[in-house]
Regions:
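Basic/polar N-terminal segments that are highly enriched at the extreme N-terminus
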Residues: 1-3
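Generic structural marker for isolated residues within well-ordered, non-membrane alpha-helices
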Residues: 72
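Conserved small/polar residues in nucleotide/adenosyl-binding loops
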Residues: 336-345
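Conserved glycine-rich beta-strand-loop-beta hairpin in the small C-terminal domain of fold type I
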Residues: 318-326
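Short glycine/threonine-rich loop-to-helix capping motif typified by GTGT followed
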Residues: 326-335
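Conserved PLP-enzyme active-site core in the AAT-like
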Residues: 5-9, 15-17, 23-24, 31, ...
Length: 348
C-alpha cells in the first residue's frame, strides 16, 4: 500500500516487510498492555461517575471546581493513588517535579538521587554546579543533596543506597533513561530501590519521576513502593491531545503537603481554575493507553529496523519497554543540553 503514496526502492519495502514480521510478537504484547490499561481507564471513568458536565471548567479562583476534582478522582483511581494534583498550571515535567520537591523538602532535609544524576533540567532546580545559581535552588534554601551513581552496567548500587538513605528525607528515582543510554528502570527495580531505602530508613519518602513511563506497563510505580509520582500531560498521560499540564499523585498527606507549595501555604488544593482545558484533558487521558501503545510500537519498529541496518539502539526491540524513549548513536559529535539552544532550533 505504501508504494502508492511514496516512491520507495524495493530494498526499502523488503526491509519494512522484514521489520514488521520480526516485530509481530512484540506488537501483540504491547496491545495486551494497552487493552488492560484501557479497561482500567474505562472502569475508573465509570466508577467515578464522569458526566458531560465535568468537561466544563472554571474561571477566576476556581474554588469548589467540581469538574477539576472529578478529574483528579479519576486519575487517582486509574494510577492507584490516594489523591492527586492534576492541573493545567504545570508547564512541563521539570516544573511539576520542582513543585513536588519543594513541597516535600524543608531546610535541613536531604534529597538523595538513588539512580544517579537526574537529567540536566533538574540540575538547576537542585543547584548542582553553576546551574540555577542565584535563582532559588533547593540547596540555596538549605536543602542538602546526595547522590548514588549507577554501577558501570547502569544498574542501581543497592549497597550504597542503603548507606546513603539513612540520612535522606526524600529518595528520588528517575524511571526513564532521560538523556543517557541506559534502559528505563522496570517496576521490579523501582520496588527493590524503594525497599532498600525504606529498610535503612523507614521514614524516607520514595519519590519517582514517572515522565515517559505512564501506561508502558499494566502497573504504575505507586504499586511498586513509591509514595509519590509526578509527570507531565504533555507526554504519555495526555495522549497527544491534552494541550498542557502535569500531575503529582500518591499518598494523600504528601499530595496535600505539596499542594500548599503549588498554590500558597494555607490554601492547598482548593484553588486553581481550569478554564477550557478539562474536556481535552479528560479526552487525552482516556485515549492515553492506546496512544502510548502506538508510540511504543513505533519505537519497537524503529529499534528493529536500526538493528537490521547495523545500528545498536537502546533498548533493543525485543526488550521489555518501561518508557517511550529510544536512544541510538548517530555518529555525530554534537552534544546539546536540554533544552536545545534557541538558535539551534530555528528552521533554516
Amino acid at each position: 500500500m505504501i508504494e502508492q503514496f511514496y516512491d520507495l526502492k524495493p530494498q526499502v519495502l523488503e526491509l519494512d516487510r522484514k521489520t514488521l514480521e520480526l516485530c509481530r510478537d512484540q506488537f501483540a504484547h504491547l496491545e495486551e498492555i494497552r487493552d488492560y490499561n484501557q479497561l482500567k481507564m474505562l472502569r475508573a471513568f465509570t466508577d467515578c461517575g464522569v458526566e458531560a458536565r465535568h468537561f466544563l471548567g472554571s474561571t477566576g479562583y476556581g474554588v469548589w471546581d467540581d469538574s477539576r476534582n472529578k478529574l483528579e478522582e479519576v486519575f487517582s483511581r486509574c494510577m492507584g493513588a490516594e489523591d492527586a494534583l492534576v492541573r493545567p498550571q504545570f508547564m512541563s515535567g521539570t516544573h511539576t517535579l520542582t513543585v513536588a520537591l519543594f513541597g516535600l523538602l524543608r531546610a535541613g532535609d536531604t534529597l538523595l538521587a538513588a539512580t544517579g544524576r537526574p537529567y540536566d533540567t533538574l540540575e538547576g532546580v537542585i543547584g548542582i554546579g553553576e546551574a540555577g545559581k542565584g535563582c532559588g535552588t533547593l540547596q540555596e534554601y538549605g536543602i542538602h543533596y546526595d547522590e548514588v551513581p549507577l554501577l558501570p552496567d547502569f544498574t542501581p548500587d543497592y549497597a550504597a543506597i542503603a548507606e546513603h538513605a539513612k540520612t535522606a528525607t526524600v529518595v528520588h528515582i528517575q524511571r526513564s533513561r532521560g538523556y543517557t543510554q541506559r534502559n528505563a528502570f522496570d517496576l521490579d527495580t523501582i520496588q527493590k530501590v524503594a525497599d532498600t531505602a525504606r529498610k535503612a530508613n523507614p521514614d524516607v519518602v520514595i519519590f519517582v519521576d514517572n515522565c515517559y513511563g505512564e501506561f508502558t506497563q499494566i502497573r504504575e510505580p505507586l504499586s511498586a513502593g513509591a509514595d509519590v509520582i509526578a509527570g507531565s500531560f504533555i507526554k504519555n498521560p495526555g495522549g497527544g491531545i491534552t494541550p498542557t499540564g502535569g500531575y503529582i499523585a500518591g499518598k494523600a498527606d504528601l499530595v496535600e503537603k505539596i499542594s500548599h507549595r503549588f498554590t500558597a501555604p494555607g490554601i492547598g488544593k482548593d484553588l486553581g481554575c481550569t478554564q477550557d482545558s478539562l474536556r481535552d484533558t479528560f479526552l487525552g487521558f482516556y485515549y492515553a493507553p492506546g496512544v502510548v501503545c502506538e508510540a511504543l510500537k513505533t519505537a519497537v519498529y524503529a529499534q528493529c529496523l536500526l538493528e537490521l541496518v547495523g545500528v545498536n539502539p537502546v533498548p533493543r526491540y525485543t526488550a521489555d519497554h518501561n518508557d517511550i524513549v529510544t536512544c541510538f548513536d548517530s555518529g555525530s559529535c554534537l552534544l546539546y543540553t536540554s533544552p536545545i539552544p534557541r538558535d539551534r532550533t530555528r528552521s533554516r
